[in-house]
UniProtKB/Swiss-Prot annotation:
Its cofactor is pyridoxal 5'-phosphate. This is Probable aminotransferase Rv3329. PANTHER family: AMINOTRANSFERASE (PTHR43094), AMINOTRANSFERASE CLASS-III (PTHR43094:SF1). NCBIfam families: PRK06541.1. InterPro entries: Aminotrans_3 (IPR005814), Aminotrans_3_PPA_site (IPR049704), PyrdxlP-dep_Trfase (IPR015424), PyrdxlP-dep_Trfase_major (IPR015421), PyrdxlP-dep_Trfase_small (IPR015422). One of its GO terms (biological process) is biotin biosynthetic process. Coiled coil: none annotated. Probable aminotransferase. Pfam families: Aminotran_3.
């Protein structure tokens, strides 16, 4: 497979205390702790699968930035696409007007999407796409004579975004508590973490059980009050939790029975992360809506989308009804142009097929870590895996909250110091997440495993008293 073209060489800045101090003084980072003595790394450059900090140190990016940089860093053609579009039409809104890049990208996404999902509403990112999907569901049912259908069901520990609506769908109490009262109408069902499933030994049977909890929740809330079910193909929070065989087939049956919309939240999973352009195709189901972002542009410019079926669009297509919703930068022409160029790379280099061919090798390489006592479970799909850390492999005993916080903080720092950028996830039992750029292959897999092995071996000695 062709490798990426290396960008023109540039000298890295000298270590700068002033730069780090400015970061501390002015920049309010996302999901980060701030305070005396806390310094955050400054990343200045990327090349292929490698990132560089302001001191010249390199790191293998095993998280694709934040599940974003599918095609790797330093893609000159994406920068060139942005520059060309900025020089032609740097901005125009989609508020009753269209632009050529938005038209073309919408057509492209409709071609990739399954079934009759042909209507594309652009946003600036993933959370906005989730907000859009919920609002579409609410208005759709009002327009079709079922105004009471407003609630949404999602899974325990699932993350769907941080704005007030998306946060109501998110299943993480710690993220929700500071911002209560939230938008009402979000309800939770169990997720599909088979490793932590009580009293289940058969994977398919467990999948049926988990899906049936959705039917149970719809019945409990009242079928005439539930508008949609939001599910990720592989659940991010909690550590790359895959769906058991038959799970989504059963969920589709349940949604059809109760006239509830199925939203496939693919903000992470779309665009090759699991394999196909849309992960619902890998798992064999057709949703009513797809939410996506991240890999759509490989992060070279912000963009998200909600893709809806023709059936959902129909009541909005009467010449009178308006979907009174939009974003200033949704479908920005520069971002849309970058998205088109990014998808050109996908097709030219066969990245989806590359992931499908190499995912078994990534899984097998990570599964070598099972010989470490601290590794309890390794799960995921495509180029999206989680490694759950435990006190005891045999009993699956996990760590206390205090232990988990110290453990993951130390593991994250040690991995980064060793030259590996990935993620430690404490939104559930402790997990290390691995999601490398889609151009990665066995050499990168081996480096990831080697560094993980070294750090987790040391961590096991400290926390398991070996």
């Amino acid at each position: 497979m062709p490798r990426i073209r290396k960008p023109p060489s540039r000298s890295l800045p000298e270590p700068s205390a002033a730069l780090a101090n400015t970061t501390t003084r002015n920049l309010w980072l996302h999901f980060a702790r701030h305070g005396a003595g806390i310094q955050h790394p400054v990343i200045v450059r990327g090349d292929g699968v490698t990132i560089f900090d302001d001191r010249g140190k390199s790191y293998l990016d095993a998280l694709s930035g934040l599940f974003v940089v599918q095609v790797g860093y330093g893609r000159a053609e994406l920068a060139e696409a942005a520059a060309r579009q900025a020089g032609t039409l740097g901005y125009f809104p989609l508020w009753g007007y269209a632009t050529p890049p938005a038209i073309e990208l919408a057509e492209r996404l409709a071609r990739y999407a399954p079934g009759d999902l042909n209507r594309v509403f652009f946003t600036s990112g993933g959370t906005e796409a989730v907000e859009t999907a919920w609002k579409v569901a609410k208005q759709y049912f009002k327009l079709t004579g079922k105004p009471g259908k407003q609630k949404v069901i999602s899974r325990s520990i699932a993350y769907h975004g941080t704005t007030q609506g998306a946060l109501a769908i998110t299943g993480l109490p710690l993220f929700k508590a500071p911002f209560e009262p939230l938008t009402p109408g979000g309800f939770r069902v169990p997720n599909t973490n088979f490793y932590r499933a009580p009293l289940h030994t058969d994977l398919k049977e467990f999948g049926r059980w988990a899906a049936d909890r959705i039917a149970e929740a719809i019945e409990f809330e009242g079928p005439d009050t539930v508008a949609a079910v939001f599910l990720e193909p592989v659940q991010n929070a909690g550590g790359c939790i895959p769906a058991p065989p038959g799970y989504f087939e059963r969920v589709r049956e349940i949604c059809d029975r109760y006239d509830v919309l199925l939203v496939s939240d693919e903000v992470i999973c779309a665009f090759g992360r699991i394999g196909s352009m849309f992960a619902c195709e890998d798992l064999g189901y057709v949703p009513d809506m797809i939410t996506c972002a991240k890999g759509l542009t490989s992060g070279y410019s912000p963009l998200g989308a909600m893709i809806a079926s023709d059936r959902l669009f129909e009541p909005f297509n009467d010449g009178e009804t308006m979907f009174a919703h939009g974003y200033t930068f949704g479908g920005h022409p520069v971002s849309a142009a970058v998205g088109l160029a990014n998808l050109d790379i996908f097709e030219r280099e066969g990245l989806s097929d590359h992931v499908k061919r190499n995912s078994p090798a990534l899984r097998a390489t990570l599964e070598k870590l099972y010989d470490l006592p601290i590794v309890g479970d390794i799960r995921g799909e495509g180029y999206f895996f989680g490694i759950e850390l435990v006190k005891d492999q045999a009993t699956k005993q996990t760590f206390t909250d205090d232990e988990r916080a110290r453990l993951l903080g130390q593991v994250s720092a040690a991995l980064f110091e060793a030259g590996l950028y990935c993620r430690t996830d404490d939104r559930g039992d402790p997990v290390v997440q691995v999601a490398p750029p889609l151009i990665s292959g066995q050499p990168e897999f081996d480096t990831i495993e080697t560094i993980l092995r070294s750090v987790l071996t040391d961590t096991g000695r400290k926390y398991l008293h070996l």
